[in-house]
A protein has these predicted regions:
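Amphipathic alpha-helical "coupling" segments that flank catalytic cores
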Residues: 1-528
């Protein structure tokens, strides 16, 4: 135990370790309680037997070489430890006289936060969310009844005598008490582990019921505080929201396929109902407006969209706070994701490049795209394509050229395909672009123009098919086929030709190239 070694070395000038023993009857108490009592309160080392189980032995550290070999010192320390272990055994016995469900009733007397109600209120929200996660198939192979039961009992140990004395054991003791009363192992494990992971590098639970309860608990905390206007700032994070976000991302970025927007809305619904005094009364319009405002836009915080400020709910909740929280959530999670992925060697600018596409809130899919992009962009071919993209983007920016899609938006020209009943509006716009400029190239195209147009015609459907199949390596390969044609285009073609039809066609070709690249990622966000 390195921590106890350092502490004892600092407390003594001439450290002498002495072995002592305590009554075996105390081993009935959970080993973590004995370890905590010995280590934290007494600065003792605990010992294990040959089987690796906790032994009824301890090592204390004296500051002198006693004439009796330390017998008196050991006896004195044994008595002190025995008194503490006696208290612990008393707590253990008293707590087990009630079921966790009976203990949980005491949560109604504990305030979680003035804006978020009692711990009992939080437990109710978490239980419903955990059940929803299972019933919607987001967390698979879990029993919804067990998930809800575990969530309703997860905080019950907060009112027990043992956790009152040893707060560090919250969750852990709940698991022991659950087993002691014969609850299913899946429920006991979920109660024990639902606080995990508590930070980077911590163990991430994999048991389905535990995942449902842990994810629901962390989501409820983050969403609640953000909607209540309580944000982490700088080095201050009094409610450990960054740590909770790491826990959420450990599930949603590594294993669970789920829309973050869907998660946000589901977790926010009970909070919004609470803030707006239940949706059935005057707050209903605000409730619905806030719920529909959730989206996965990491730039939403910078847009400062107007929100209704004329409503003040209970406990100081206002629309200003609610809508500010909604706008800040995507950026908060995006920043946490960058920090989390930095240790895995993933570049933050590539995460930005994929986030900038908008609407990609399945983090498992997003990271798969980012990693494929990083593999490609770090090759010589990828660097060349990035350089070609930036040159094209700079020309288009200088000319304020947005392609046909932008022309329609600026001029308001009626789109002849606007009435086409096609759910894929991008397909409509692409058809419009093709129809509008089909006759513009009424001049002899230079070979490099033909080559780039032909490469785009081949790369666009290949990339679209690969993206639809989530084969991001194949999508990068499709982009790679554009590298040589775009280089040749810049070497052989004068974009800003004097003839307007040539200039327009060539700028449209570059806009088409930029759009093809943007289907994979926004290369303007990539450094280099």
């Amino acid at each position: 135990d390195e921590g106890v070694v350092i502490e004892n070395a600092g407390l003594t000038e001439w450290p002498i370790p002495l072995l002592g023993r305590f009554d075996e009857a105390y081993l009935e108490v959970p080993p973590e309680v004995i370890q905590l009592t010995a280590r934290v309160n007494q600065k003792y080392f605990v010992c294990e037997d040959e089987a690796g189980k906790l032994a009824n032995a301890f090592i204390c550290t004296a500051n002198i070489e006693a004439e009796d070999g330390g017998a008196a010192i050991v006896d004195g320390n044994r008595k002190v430890l025995a008194a503490r272990l006696s208290d612990a055994r008393f707590f253990w016995d008293v707590d087990r006289k009630k079921t966790l469900a009976q203990h949980a009733k005491g949560l109604e007397r504990i305030t979680f936060h003035e804006k978020l109600g009692t711990v009992a209120d939080k437990v109710d929200r978490v239980a419903k969310l955990a059940r929803w996660l299972v019933e919607e198939g987001i967390v698979k192979d879990a029993d919804p009844d067990m998930a809800e039961q575990a969530a309703r009992l997860a905080k019950a140990d907060l009112v027990t005598e043992m956790v009152g004395e040893f707060p560090e054991l919250q969750g852990l003791m709940g698991g022991y008490y659950a087993r002691a009363e014969g609850l299913p192992d899946a429920v006991a494990d979920a109660i024990r582990d639902h606080y995990q992971p508590v930070g980077q590098g911590d163990k991430v639970p994999t048991a389905p019921v535990t995942v449902a309860v842990s994810l629901a608990d962390k989501l409820d905390t983050i969403i609640g505080f953000y909607l209540g206007g309580e944000f982490p700032t700088g080095s201050k994070d009094p409610f450990a929201l960054r740590r909770a976000a790491f826990g959420v991302l450990a599930y949603t970025a590594d294993r669970l396929r789920v829309s973050m927007t869907t998660l946000f809305r589901q977790a926010a619904e009970p909070h919004l109902a609470f803030f707006y005094c239940e949706p059935k009364d005057v707050g209903r319009p605000y409730f619905e407006a806030a719920l529909s405002a959730f989206n996965w836009d990491i730039d939403a915080e910078d847009k400062h969209e107007a929100s209704p400020l004329d409503y003040r709910g209970p406990f100081g909740a206002t629309n200003a706070n609610v809508f500010a929280g909604i706008r800040r959530l995507p950026r908060f999670f995006a920043d946490r994701l960058k920090v989390k992925q930095r240790e895995a060697g993933v570049r933050h600018d590539l995460i930005d490049a994929v986030f900038a596409l908008g609407g990609e809130d399945d983090l498992v899919r997003l990271l798969a795209r980012v990693k494929a992009l990083q593999v490609y962009i770090e090759t010589a071919e990828g660097a060349d394509l990035l350089a070609g993209y930036k040159r094209a983007a700079n020309i288009l920016k200088k000319e304020d050229w947005h392609g046909t899609e932008g022309e329609i938006a600026r001029t308001g020209e009626e789109d002849p395909l606007a009435l086409v009943d096609d759910p894929d509006m991008k397909a409509v716009i692409d058809a419009k672009m093709a129809a509008r400029h089909a006759g513009e190239a009424n001049y002899a195209l230079e070979p490099a123009e033909k080559a780039l147009a032909g490469a785009l015609s081949q790369a666009e459907p290949r990339a679209a098919k690969a993206l639809a199949e989530e084969d991001f390596a194949a999508a990068m390969a499709a982009l790679a086929s554009l590298r040589a044609p775009i280089d040749r285009f810049f070497e052989e073609v004068t974009v800003n030709a004097e003839e307007e039809n040539k200039r327009a066609h060539r700028l449209d070709l570059l806009a088409r190239f930029r759009a093809a690249v943007h289907k994979v990622a926004d290369f303007s966000r990539i450094e280099g």
